[in-house]
Amino acid sequence: MGANDGIVSTAGLVVGVAAASTDVPAILTAGFAGLSAGAVSMALGEYVSVSAQRDTERAMLRTERRELEQMPEAELEELTGLLQRKGLEPDTARAAAKELTERNALAAHAEVELGIHPDDLANPWAAALSSAVSFTIGALIPLLVVVLPPEHLRIPPVTFVAVLVALA
C-alpha cells in the first residue's frame, strides 16, 4: 500500500510542477520533497498505528495472565471449550488444554483465545521502516520517469504510462 501512495502522490506532484515549469532540477526538488515528506508521514502513521496495536495486545496479555493466576480452573475450562469449537472431541480437548496449560499457559491461551503470541508482538519500528521504504520505492518511479526519457516525452505520456504500469 505504501508503494502505491508513493507512486500516486509523487506522480501528481511532479506532473503539477512540470506543468508549470520544464526545469528538471525544480521538478526533482519538488519530487524529492514530496518523497521525503511522504515517507516520513507514512512511517510516523504506521508507527503510531502499530504501537497502539501492540499496547492493546499487551493489555490483553496482562488480563489473560491475571485470569490465569486468579482462576486457573475456569481458564482451563475456557481453553477446553475453545479447542472443542475448533473440532476436538471433549476428552481430547481437555487433555490438549491441560498439556498446553502445563507447558505455557499464557502462550496457549493467548494463541487460541486471542490469536496472538506473547513473544511475537507487533514491532512499530519495523512497521515504520517498512512503510517508509515502500513509499520511497513507489515514489522513485515517477521521479525516474521525469529524468530518464527525452524532454518532450516526460510529461504526460511517459509519466502516466509508468504510473499505470506501476499500479497494475
How would you name each of these model-derived features?
Residues 4, 50-132:
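Cytosol/matrix-facing amphipathic helices and coiled-coil assembly/linker segments
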Residues 27-32, 128-132, 156-161:
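Hydrophobic alpha-helical transmembrane segments
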Residues 141-142, 157-168:
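Transmembrane alpha-helical segments of integral membrane proteins
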Residues 34, 135, 163-167:
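Residue-level recognition of pore/gate-forming positions within transmembrane alpha-helices
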Residues 24, 30-55, 99:
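Selected alpha-helical membrane-embedding segments in polytopic membrane proteins
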Residues 8, 12-13, 41-53, 107-111, ...:
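Alpha-helical transmembrane segments and their lipid-water interface positions
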Residues 1-14, 118-144:
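Transmembrane alpha-helical segments and their cytosolic interface motifs
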Residues 15-30, 144-155:
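Helix-coil boundary and interhelical linker segments in multi-pass alpha-helical membrane proteins
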